[in-house]
């Protein structure tokens, strides 16, 4: 079932900085990563449209689309608009995944959530790709847009203790371990704009988000990042 599978797909961006073991980073990949970090780390808010593609050997390709909002510290709102309305919210401490047609909402502490979208809140943080990947190099994959390049990130398999304080977002997100093979990030090397993220998981499962129309530092209301379950909606705790 797609909903269950999405909760199992974790992003390389979840892994907190390590105290040791430097990543193997090619010079061109390092320059592209710096452009990406410079583009987003100073933004207080971000907004974009997204197209999600999920594929596995049993269900084939499924496509959804909507809008996503990010705000410091570690808050997100994913509004799915087509083909079905859904809502994924992180308020920095708790993540909620609400499907109105199911009359249920799944809830998890951010430190326990393995949903791969959760770590993307670090776009507005200070994490560096060179600290998050065991290997970071240029992929031979063709980019979707002219002028872009594709970074290939191989995740660190070991769990790591973060340098940051316990209440830091990087320290609070659940670590991942052997849940995916690689992450491909399509980036414009000049502007640093993130165009696409593709997570490749064992078993032929892939989850891809294509982003567009990025807007930075727009005024976003606090209420966007808080969820109140409507009357009659069952709250289900995500299994630990």
Predicted regions and their residues:
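Extracytoplasmic segments of membrane-associated envelope/inner-membrane machinery
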Residues: 98, 105-140, 147-153
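Bacterial N-terminal signal peptides that target proteins for export
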Residues: 1-8
